[in-house]
Amino acid sequence: MKLLLLCLGLILVHAHEEENDVVKGNFDISKISGDWYSILLASDIKEKIEENGSMRVFVKDIEVLSNSSLIFTMHTKVNGKCTKISLICNKTEKDGEYDVVHDGYNLFRIIETAYEDYIIFHLNNVNQEQEFQLMELYGRKPDVSPKVKEKFVRYCQGMEIPKENILDLTQVDRCLQARQSEAAQVSSAE
């Protein structure tokens, strides 16, 4: 019985520690540098994120610059071929908020992160007369826990993005081969 209570106590402590790792403000941007994988993608205009959509991109890594700007290295498919793109995103005055021009003007912010596990972004895009919003879930590994995915779905629902507009990118070609061949080229050059 004591062993059972001890195990239960340890489980509760561990669960509490995991929740404390989640950051929703006062972000330490240096901790988001490094490799990431696109996990879930959602938009209120689904065509933007479907195959051949202008916002269907697959993150490779994020680099933080000395002025707190971010460089996102991503892949997108052009005529069925994975193509590398880099986007420089400028820090705004608000915590965790950035802007970038890509298929219009984009203003995005970090919703929450557990630096070593996942990060969730919300983006608003304005392109001429059309506006849309987009949500992204990135993971440090090729997939994240169902609990994190459920949290992302709840955020999307809060932003009035329907569940059917959430794409699970772990089920599609995310250009992982292009990412691996780039890493192999870098290591052979060193």
Swiss-Prot record:
Domain of life from the UniProt record: Eukaryota
Molecular function per GO: odorant binding; small molecule binding
Gene3D superfamilies per the UniProt record, alphabetical: 2.40.128.20
Chain intervals for the UniProt region annotation (No IgE-binding): 100-109
Pfam families noted in UniProt: Lipocalin (PF00061)
Tissue: Expressed in saliva (at protein level). Expressed in dander (at protein level). According to PubMed:22104604, expressed in submaxillary gland. In contrast, according to PubMed:22515174, not expressed in submaxillary gland. Expressed in bladder and skin, but not in tongue.
InterPro entries noted in UniProt: Calycin, Lipocalin, Lipocalin_CS, Lipocln_cytosolic_FA-bd_dom, Maj_urinary
GO cellular component terms attached to this protein's record: extracellular region; extracellular space
Places the protein is found: Secreted
Principal subcellular localization: secreted
Region (IgE-binding): 43-54, 76-83, 91-97, 125-132, 139-152
Disulphides: 82-175
Xref: PROSITE patterns: LIPOCALIN
Stretches assigned to coiled coil: none
Signal peptide: 1-15
Residues modified by glycosylation: 52, 67, 90
Keywords noted in UniProt: Allergen, Disulfide bond, Glycoprotein, Secreted, Signal
Family to which this protein belongs: Belongs to the calycin superfamily. Lipocalin family.
Self-association state and partner proteins as the record states: Monomer.
Protein name as annotated: Lipocalin Can f 6.0101
The species this protein was found in: Canis lupus familiaris
Classification lineage: Eukaryota, Metazoa, Chordata, Craniata, Vertebrata
